[in-house]
Amino acid sequence: MCKAFPDSVAASGGGIIGSTTAYFLTRHPSFNPSIHHITVLEAASIAGAASGKAGGLLGLWAYPQCLVPLSYQLHADLAAEHDGVERWGYRKVGCGKITATLKAKHLNGSPAPKRQSNGLDLVKEENGQPKEWVKLPKQDQAASGLLKNSKLPSDLDWVDGSLIREYAEMGAIGFTETAQVHPYQFTTAIAKLAQEKGVHFRLNSKATEINLNQTKTQVESVEYLDRASNQMRSILGVTDVVVAAGPWAGRLVPSSSVEGLRAHSVIFEADVSPYAVFTSISLPREWVPAHRAAAGQKRTHMGYVDPEVYARPGREAYACGEPDPSAPLPETADLVECDEAQCDDLAAYISTVSPVLEAAPISAKQACYMPRHMRSGVEMGPLIGRTSVTGLWMAAGHTCWGIQNGPATGKLISEFIFEGEAKSANIDELDPLKYNVGA
């Protein structure tokens, strides 16, 4: 709803959601830079959290489906308008799942030490049982049902075809398409485009409190910690506050029930064909990765593991693995700790089916926290829209699909703020008011 008086919008979070929100606010037909003032508070740096360390996968088969088609198309539109192919690596990719059952003979005798077996047992959890691999929530049941058995593509030559028992391709063009962006490049480029239209990004500025009026019905100001000076500061007279703080959203708005889940990833230096590959790898019990064996440790996981690998432009391959629920969310993104051994596990598991990646240097080992909207222990969809407090908007809880669904989220939030409702998609199922958020 475009107001006749100066309108101040504050967004908490300089990741993909905060950046796309700022971008689409400045592109809305009602935006007037002389009366509309937009400030983005970021506790660390732009794309310093999951938005800079995610896989960047885009898929028409992603979830929630009320959001996905709009956002997938917006990615194509943004790439066409702003040269996304060059600026952030936008491209279509093949996508499928490989299934491999490995025997000791496949691993022994390899010159790579990480394939040697020393017969150690598996690490036991506290209950005495071997640890099972926990799958990332990337594919829901509907997406898994779209996989179709097919031949291993001839250009998917960075996977050892002799070990692959089954390959399932992700569906048909126009319905289950898959694309990708480089998440850090995309997020920082979108933030820069917003900044060029007048958005003010305050970095190292951690939002700590959203202040309401005396009746607790409307936003009035935002308090934040200027980490450079260690001084508390305020943005006064705000008319709208967008909480797009990823896993930290729940700390600003506890009723949102948004929390963080740590996940690790590695980046290989490898020039490989453009595929996103999901895996299901059965490992022989006696095999132990080299880094574990060298430390006299046991293998962490029992039989099956299913890491994911995405080829990227610029001679990169990105791999991610299971989430780690034991690590508490730190205060800011630059304080996230990476467990290097988990990254080494991930690289070792992928190396069992990809000699190319086994031989490739690893340029980064990293961790981030996925934002999850949780209710009674169950993961729900993201929260997008108005809350019970006038002027307070939620845009958080996107789990694995923040990069994919960021553009739609930003566009819809801009419609909420300027027009009072979402116009480009029906996202009633993501309504924060269903959960009385804001109270």
Stretches with model-predicted labels:
Residues 23-27, 56-58, 88-91, 239-390:
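Active-site substrate-recognition segment that forms the wall
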Residues 24, 36-37, 43-117:
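Conserved FAD-binding subdomain of flavin-dependent enzymes
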Residues 349-439:
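C-terminal catalytic lobe of FAD-dependent flavoproteins
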Residues 66-70, 173-193, 335-342, 400, ...:
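Short beta-strand to alpha-helix junction loop
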Residues 17, 46, 248:
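Conserved Rossmann-like nucleotide-cofactor binding loop
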Residues 5, 229-240:
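Core beta-strand elements of the Rossmann-like FAD/NAD(P) dinucleotide-binding domain
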Residues 81-82, 90-91, 97-203, 209-217, ...:
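Flavin (FAD/FMN) cofactor-binding and adjacent substrate-gating region
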Residues 5-39:
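N-terminal Rossmann-like FAD-binding beta1-loop-alpha1 element of flavoenzymes
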